[in-house]
């Protein structure tokens, strides 16, 4: 049908015999638009309880200099938002200097100089792997993940971001964010991890709750030979620490069911952490029925600065949305050491949940490296082993060939994604390629299948 027909023919008449569409018929767990360098993963469509990650680089029109930027959804809101476009839209100085630049996004800025042309931009990320497959119409999975790569042009830095959603219950779940960054030719000065969250209060402490003794600082500024966007940050406080840290961002809700985003981050040598305020989140100010006056509230901002490279000392974070009436399920997050016979960027995470489940995660920058942490051995970009007293188990092999625990071993001759779950006395699996599962003295040769099916 030609577009001109809407104006030259008779008025358009809607056939009321055609039933209204259901949005669930058009949504998949993973959505990828390479023409816009935009990747979305979700674990459901419940407005209050589902989680969603939106990642984007810069491909096409109306794009920003943001590297691998991400937004997180939780408890009905875009809790971790991009900044927007400023008070005077695309023509304003605040857009040119801040809103279109790295520090206004949830990303990593290298040496304080990362930037490139905005509006019409041609700086896409490369999708290395994801599960479920983009556009695949399957049930929402208990674990999803993605891995993307980006070459930051100004600093000539390689950046890799691995993100995951882990569903732990009908109303609970958490995000995993592993961001690796290093300059191609070395000479790294620092890598700055920016994270912005909705809310009015922010509490940054060591992971055990002890004070970091944050002190006022002017370190994040244009005077540090950084892009001018840094000077838009204010009320800055910092501490140099190698400790694991925890940050709570809180929205004070009118009904007093306050919403929080809880963030745990792995510590590292030569690291500083900052609490700060950024200009208001203009992008949220146009959304009706927000819980507070967005234009009147500066944006809560966390920055982690890694001196030197941040590839073998990556930024590793776990995020969990919660509220007063729906508290989080995580009691603690630790980051155990990972053993490997090959040098590389190997990450271990242990998430202890209040109801007894323990999730163990290993991630590597090379899926061919054999990595071991505790009783878990993997060859994979990302692997998870969740166990609740043996009667509620989950095993996920992401972009790898081996996941081995004391009672279960998953292996494949080719790099694959495998989901194996045990619940209510039934084993189910899904796999993107042929694989083997060994457990209880038996060996199962499994064929590929996208939906969870009985073993």
Residue ranges and their predicted role:
Residues 50-57, 79-84, 120-121, 160-163, ...:
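Short amphipathic beta-strand/extended segments with alternating polar/hydrophobic composition
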Residues 146-149, 247-249, 344-353:
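Short, hydrophobic/proline-enriched secondary-structure or compact coil segments at domain edges
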Residues 194-271:
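Polysaccharide-binding surfaces and accessory modules of carbohydrate-active proteins
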């Amino acid at each position: 049908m030609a577009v001109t027909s809407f104006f030259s023919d008779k008025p358009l008449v809607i056939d009321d015999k055609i039933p209204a569409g259901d949005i669930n018929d058009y949504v998949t767990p993973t959505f990828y638009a390479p023409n816009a360098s935009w990747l979305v993963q979700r674990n459901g469509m419940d407005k209050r309880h589902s989680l969603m990650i939106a990642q984007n680089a810069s491909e096409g029109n109306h794009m920003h200099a943001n590297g691998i930027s991400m937004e997180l959804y939780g408890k009905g809101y875009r809790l971790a938002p991009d900044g927007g476009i400023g008070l005077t839209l695309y023509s304003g100085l605040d857009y040119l200097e801040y809103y279109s630049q790295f520090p206004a996004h949830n990303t990593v800025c290298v040496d304080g100089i990362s930037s490139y042309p905005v509006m019409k931009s041609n700086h896409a990320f490369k999708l290395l792997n994801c599960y479920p497959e983009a556009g695949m119409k399957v049930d929402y999975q208990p674990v999803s993940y993605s891995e993307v790569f980006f070459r930051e042009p100004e600093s000539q830095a390689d950046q890799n971001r691995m993100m995951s959603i882990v569903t732990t219950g009908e109303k609970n779940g958490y995000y995993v964010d592993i961001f690796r960054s290093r300059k191609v030719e070395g000479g790294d000065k620092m890598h700055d991890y920016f994270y912005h969250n909705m809310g009015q209060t922010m509490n940054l402490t060591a992971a055990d709750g002890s004070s970091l003794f944050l002190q006022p600082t002017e370190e994040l500024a244009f005077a540090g030979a950084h892009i001018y966007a840094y000077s838009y940050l204010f009320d800055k406080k910092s501490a140099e620490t190698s400790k694991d840290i925890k940050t709570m961002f809180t929205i004070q809700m009118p009904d007093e069911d306050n919403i929080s985003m809880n963030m745990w981050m792995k510590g590292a040598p030569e690291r500083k952490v900052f609490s700060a305020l950024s200009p208001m989140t203009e992008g949220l100010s146009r959304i009706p029925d927000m819980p507070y006056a967005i234009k009147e509230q500066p944006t809560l901002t966390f920055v982690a600065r890694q001196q030197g490279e941040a590839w073998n000392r990556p930024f590793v974070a776990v995020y969990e949305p919660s509220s007063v009436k729906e508290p989080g399920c995580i009691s603690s997050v630790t980051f155990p050491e990972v053993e490997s016979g090959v040098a590389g960027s190997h990450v271990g995470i242990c998430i202890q949940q209040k109801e007894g489940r323990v999730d163990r995660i290993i991630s590597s920058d090379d899926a061919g490296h054999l990595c071991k942490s505790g009783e878990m051995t993997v060859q994979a970009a990302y692997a998870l082993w969740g166990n609740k007293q043996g009667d509620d188990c989950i095993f996920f092999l992401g972009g790898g060939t081996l996941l081995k625990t004391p009672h279960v071993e998953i292996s494949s001759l080719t790099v694959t994604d495998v989901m194996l779950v045990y619940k209510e006395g039934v084993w189910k699996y899904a796999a993107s390629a042929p694989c083997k599962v060994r457990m209880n003295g038996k060996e199962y040769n499994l064929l590929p299948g996208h939906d969870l099916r009985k073993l």
